[in-house]
């Protein structure tokens, strides 16, 4: 199979780290800021950042509805932290009216923004991750958690009692930031999903 072209939504957030991780994981990474770039990718990463800002910029760049349409048509996607929030079908504590995080509805789940607390409450630790043969180093920065999953959603990881990684079909989401750890397991898993191998 040819090397998949995987985009990173480059409107706000830690784009550079995901581009590097995808390259190391065997993909051809590219930034996505325009509809033509979105149309050219085989998969998309929605990075961490600020979900209300990303939502505002998706609207400003006329990408919100095209992205929702591509997800509905089966585009493989991976969301980390704010990206997990964006991929939800429902967002709790979505923000003030007119400046809210807007759900892309890629995964049938309810996510609570900033559930683990403020920036000073950020933490990291090793967690078990279904499908991987080793624990994953998880860095949580003002992280969300999943409060509800639909019947078709697989829970991949928990931190304590809280769901922090899920998958539905070809859409993957984590509440943590694997791109900052040097462990490329999650990005390799996503590249395999894009290639139809996982």
UniProtKB/Swiss-Prot annotation:
Q: Which family does it belong to?
A: Belongs to the glutaminase PdxT/SNO family.
- Write out the GO cellular component annotations: cytosol; glutaminase complex
InterPro entries linked: Class_I_gatase-like, PdxT/SNO, PdxT/SNO_CS
Q: What does this protein do?
A: Catalyzes the hydrolysis of glutamine to glutamate and ammonia as part of the biosynthesis of pyridoxal 5'-phosphate. The resulting ammonia molecule is channeled to the active site of PdxS.
SUPFAM superfamilies recorded: Class I glutamine amidotransferase-like
Query: What EC number(s) does its UniProt record assign?
Result: 4.3.3.6, 3.5.1.2
Q: Which reaction does it catalyse?
A: aldehydo-D-ribose 5-phosphate + D-glyceraldehyde 3-phosphate + L-glutamine = pyridoxal 5'-phosphate + L-glutamate + phosphate + 3 H2O + H(+); L-glutamine + H2O = L-glutamate + NH4(+)
Q: According to its UniProt record, which residues of this chain constitute the active site? A: 81, 177, 179
| Taxonomy, superkingdom | Bacteria
Could you cite one Gene Ontology molecular function of this protein?
pyridoxal 5'-phosphate synthase (glutamine hydrolysing) activity
Q: Which UniProt keywords are present, listed alphabetically?
A: Glutamine amidotransferase, Hydrolase, Lyase, Pyridoxal phosphate
Stated name of the protein: Pyridoxal 5'-phosphate synthase subunit PdxT
- How the protein assembles, per its UniProt entry? In the presence of PdxS, forms a dodecamer of heterodimers. Only shows activity in the heterodimer.
Q: Which residues are involved in binding L-glutamine?
A: 49-51, 113, 141-142
> Alphabetically, which GO biological process terms does the record hold?
glutamine catabolic process; pyridoxal phosphate biosynthetic process; pyridoxine metabolic process
Under the heading Pfam families, the entry gives: SNO
Q: In which pathway does it act?
A: Cofactor biosynthesis; pyridoxal 5'-phosphate biosynthesis
């Amino acid at each position: 199979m040819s090397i998949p072209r995987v985009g990173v939504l480059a409107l706000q957030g830690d784009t550079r780290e995901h581009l590097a991780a995808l390259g190391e994981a065997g993909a051809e990474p590219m930034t996505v800021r325009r509809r033509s770039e979105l149309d050219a990718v085989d998969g998309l990463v929605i990075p961490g950042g600020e979900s209300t800002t990303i939502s505002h910029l998706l609207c400003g760049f006329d990408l919100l509805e095209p992205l929702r349409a591509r997800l509905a048509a089966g585009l493989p996607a991976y969301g980390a932290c704010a990206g997990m929030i964006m991929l939800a079908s429902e967002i709790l504590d979505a923000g003030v009216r007119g400046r809210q995080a807007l759900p892309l509805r890629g995964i049938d789940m309810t996510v609570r923004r900033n559930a683990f607390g403020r920036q000073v409450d950020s933490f990291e630790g090793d967690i078990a991750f279904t499908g991987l043969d080793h624990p994953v180093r998880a860095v949580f920065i003002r992280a969300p958690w999943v409060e509800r999953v639909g019947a078709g959603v697989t829970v991949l990881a928990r931190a304590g009692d809280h769901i922090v990684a899920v998958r539905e079909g070809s859409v993957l989401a984590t509440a943590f930031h694997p791109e900052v750890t040097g462990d490329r397991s999650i990005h390799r898993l996503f590249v395999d999903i894009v290639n139809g191998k996982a």
